[in-house]
Amino acid sequence: MAVKKYRPYTPSRRQMTTADFSGLTKKRPEKALTEALPKTGGRNNRGRITSRFIGGGHKRLYRIIDFKRRDKSGVSARVAAIEYDPNRSARIALLHFADGEKRYILAPEGLQVGATINTGPEAEPKLGNALPLRFIPVGAVVHALELVPGKGAQLARSAGTSVQVQGKESEYVIVRLPSGELRRIHTECYATIGAVGNAEHKNINLGKAGRSRWLGRKPHQRGSAMNPVDHPHGGGEGRTGAGRQPVSPWGQLAKGLKTRRKRKNSDRFIVTRRGGK
């Protein structure tokens, strides 16, 4: 995928870039694999804001993605189309299985329409195939990695991300995550061969505020621009500093505070933290 630039015939067009959608082969989603996605406006079931600066945006249909892929072991599938998904940065691939079922998966980099994909312990470690980590060779690049066997993919799902298999020890496999963290994952966890496609997504420049609103993002208000009743940084005559360490609206330190729980159960699976610590 390439990034498309525009002539600067307006100020916002000067910086704006978009994705080149030439790699897509189908415009309309598979109706049976979509469902309604109601807007929340960042509110919970009590109507209170739990996630700020969310609201508006273009209406979307949610594409149901198969993140488990276990129940199709031994059933081959053909890649029927590569599609756009407004709910994620990656592209998605429509699979037609030999038993007649259709499913969506994340489209790895280099996957072509017409390719054959397999799932299960007997599958070869080639692009798009999903299999347990115990059968994936050391050095292989994978994505859509499970943390718990059978729970479904949780790691390396966004555009351009991947995980590398570093080594194996008894019932665990050591992998390098996109953050640089080395972590033990159970050998029965499934992963898909290859890196997630649409790697140029990180180079997209929205160019104008309105395009951010189309995505459902509202302006992020600075605390120093608020009143004292609304934020610890608020108030003062004219532009004034916070007068304290930067904090959140609820008083929690905003820079450098470690929020991970001490003695968390999953600490024993982390070999090296991100940053080499």
From Swiss-Prot:
<dbReference type="GO" id="GO:0019843">
    <property type="term" value="F:rRNA binding"/>
</dbReference>
<dbReference type="InterPro" id="IPR014726">
    <property type="entry name" value="Ribosomal_uL2_dom3"/>
</dbReference>
<dbReference type="GO" id="GO:0003735">
    <property type="term" value="F:structural constituent of ribosome"/>
</dbReference>
<dbReference type="InterPro" id="IPR022671">
    <property type="entry name" value="Ribosomal_uL2_CS"/>
</dbReference>
<dbReference type="Pfam" id="PF03947">
    <property type="entry name" value="Ribosomal_L2_C"/>
</dbReference>
<dbReference type="GO" id="GO:0015934">
    <property type="term" value="C:large ribosomal subunit"/>
</dbReference>
<keyword id="KW-0687">Ribonucleoprotein</keyword>
<dbReference type="GO" id="GO:0016740">
    <property type="term" value="F:transferase activity"/>
</dbReference>
<keyword id="KW-0699">rRNA-binding</keyword>
<dbReference type="Pfam" id="PF00181">
    <property type="entry name" value="Ribosomal_L2"/>
</dbReference>
<dbReference type="InterPro" id="IPR022666">
    <property type="entry name" value="Ribosomal_uL2_RNA-bd_dom"/>
</dbReference>
<comment type="function">
    <text>One of the primary rRNA binding proteins. Required for association of the 30S and 50S subunits to form the 70S ribosome, for tRNA binding and peptide bond formation. It has been suggested to have peptidyltransferase activity; this is somewhat controversial. Makes several contacts with the 16S rRNA in the 70S ribosome.</text>
</comment>
<dbReference type="InterPro" id="IPR014722">
    <property type="entry name" value="Rib_uL2_dom2"/>
</dbReference>
<keyword id="KW-0689">Ribosomal protein</keyword>
<dbReference type="InterPro" id="IPR022669">
    <property type="entry name" value="Ribosomal_uL2_C"/>
</dbReference>
<dbReference type="InterPro" id="IPR002171">
    <property type="entry name" value="Ribosomal_uL2"/>
</dbReference>
<feature type="compositionally biased region" description="Basic residues">
    <location>
        <begin position="210"/>
        <end position="221"/>
    </location>
</feature>
<feature type="region of interest" description="Disordered">
    <location>
        <begin position="210"/>
        <end position="277"/>
    </location>
</feature>
<keyword id="KW-0694">RNA-binding</keyword>
<dbReference type="InterPro" id="IPR005880">
    <property type="entry name" value="Ribosomal_uL2_bac/org-type"/>
</dbReference>
<dbReference type="InterPro" id="IPR008991">
    <property type="entry name" value="Translation_prot_SH3-like_sf"/>
</dbReference>
<protein>
    <recommendedName>
        <fullName>Large ribosomal subunit protein uL2</fullName>
    </recommendedName>
</protein>
<feature type="region of interest" description="Disordered">
    <location>
        <begin position="1"/>
        <end position="20"/>
    </location>
</feature>
<dbReference type="GO" id="GO:0002181">
    <property type="term" value="P:cytoplasmic translation"/>
</dbReference>
<comment type="subunit">
    <text>Part of the 50S ribosomal subunit. Forms a bridge to the 30S subunit in the 70S ribosome.</text>
</comment>
<comment type="similarity">
    <text>Belongs to the universal ribosomal protein uL2 family.</text>
</comment>
<dbReference type="InterPro" id="IPR012340">
    <property type="entry name" value="NA-bd_OB-fold"/>
</dbReference>
